Amino acid sequence: MLAVGLAAQAQTPIWDTSGNSNLNGIYYFRQVFYFLGDASGDLGEATAIYGNIKFDGNGGYTLTQSTTQPWVYYDSYYGGYTANQTGTYSISASGYGFISSPNPRYPGDYIYGLVSQQGIFVGSSTENTNGYNDMFVAAPLASPMPTAANFSGTYVFSDLDLVGAAQGQPAGMLSMMFTLTADGACHFGTTTVTGYAGTTTTPYTQISTLPTCSFSNGAAVVTFPTNGLLTQGQKYLYFSKDGNFVFGGSPYTGYNPWDMIVGVKVSSGTPNFSDLYYQAGIDELGGYLDTFYGSLDLPALHPQTIMEHQRIEDLFYTPAATDSTYLDSYTLTSGATYSTSLARYAVGAGGAIRIGSGIGPNLGLSVALQAPTLTPTGVFLNPQGIVNAASWAPFTAGIAPGELLTFSNSSNLAADTVVATSPFPTSLDQVQVSIGGLPAPIYYVSPTQISVIVPYAVTGPIADIQVTNNGVLSNTVPVYVNQTSPGVFTQTSNGLGYGATEHNADGSIVTAANPAVIGETVAVYVTGLGAVSPTIADGAPGPTSTLSEVPAGSVTAYIGSATIAPVQATVVYAGLAPALSGLYQIDITIPAGLTAGDNYLYISGPDAYNSQSLIPISTATSAAETPAVAPVPTLGKQPPGRLKVDPKAKRAPSPRGGGGTPKQ
């Protein structure tokens, strides 16, 4: 067992609490925990906590109890007992924040996550050091409480049954989807459950005729037959205020008390699946677990493209949480569903909610909920608009020292549009930016957008960002600080399509007509690689004589296609781009074993990963060349702003494999 004792009390993180009122009132909640038991990734223990939680709107909560829906802590190793009765929370203006854990064994841990437009909180304790993965969901209870009459229409559910918690084996895990058509009187008729078990790739089907359900204190109790192949026994289902989102799981007296269920009400027609969403989920991939929270963005001008961020706790491979930013794609069917190589998804509630279920052997469950729309006042720094200037990955991704950031979709940040010259100043057109209490070098300012460099001395785990315009302060925005947060600049300046990559031999741009060749060295332009040596002043250009490099071995690069697993490329150089401010350069040698055409470029640091950009490859071999830092590019001289063009990459892989065919 990795962790069986009580955790030490941790210090509460410093966080913006201006959004605490976003959690207010009585909620239903469910939290599931999974503990690794051995070096093979087998489960040693599982826990479920569920019931009612009352948020006071001011940073405190109490677990409330009734005779029929008590708050319950049930552990596969220790048995059942009650959870913590009180706790605290901090929620920022964007809905991003944390809740102290109700798990009595780990009172010092925090559940990080986000509050959606619907007031639903989803998250995970990604920063815990006690050896577990978890997922937490809380939704406000409607008043009056839901009854059978509210359970009407068609609902699609995703269910992750971790029966392996009792068996100690991932092979016992089940990932499934099913549809319930309710008539408002707790009648469902026949339902078909399809899913996957363990490491198999063959789907299973279970056809069940459900009896009538019952309601207790606003929760539905639905019972599946006890001989079900995929799911069986009682399920407690909790409803959001509008009835469009449903979640829950088995009671502690049930067949498998450690499952998690999420569901969405669907209707005919194509939903408006667009803009920003907050997400959380569980993955059981090939014998090991990870859990995550984060966000995903569907840019309006880039149809069928999803830019995703996940803050992942992956205990089997990395004991500390990591950031992953990547692309995905989708084509909604007439039933508002779509599939990738890793998961099946259903979109409902008019496009406001997406649920996901894994495809074997990649089992899992996820939920994404539409983010709140923020109302600007005064000098307004939009928390949802703070992004990596290269990748434009969603705002929940952490920042890194030396990273070039862009603040977008804000208001009254500056009087005019002004672009600085290198070295970048810390004051431009009467505008200053503070990150972690340190002045940040400014690339450009405009009324709605600013680009800055994170000072090298900024430390974490959390830093506040604030803008001052002519003496007037903006709101403060808390962000995570990583060692690295890599983002690849692209030729379209929007984080999509071909990466900003040059042939080392002549400095020409790598394009489909001028592809990279097996064996040659190319230069990739990125930001967010963190600390360098020798150090330089904030905002200064990279030196051209003694080059400033990142720590040896801290950056890795892989290249792969939809049909070829990623192949590691040799990193010849990784450090600041000579003569440019805010840009890093990675020189990589194109490895053998790739397929001709568009390939995905994977760049990772010790705590963050990016796989958004493409690199075109020719399978011809190049003459041997002497690796060297490429000539100074002109890429850093592009005007500020995000170019509005269609993405070149319609599909990129999940950070954990899979993927479709890249298209041009």
What are these regions (language model features)?
Residues 1-11, 661-664:
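Sec-dependent, cleavable N-terminal signal peptides
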Residues 9-380:
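Mature soluble binding/inhibitory domains
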Residues 35-41, 164-171, 175, 185, ...:
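A sequence-level detector for low-complexity, Ser/Thr- and acidic-rich stretches
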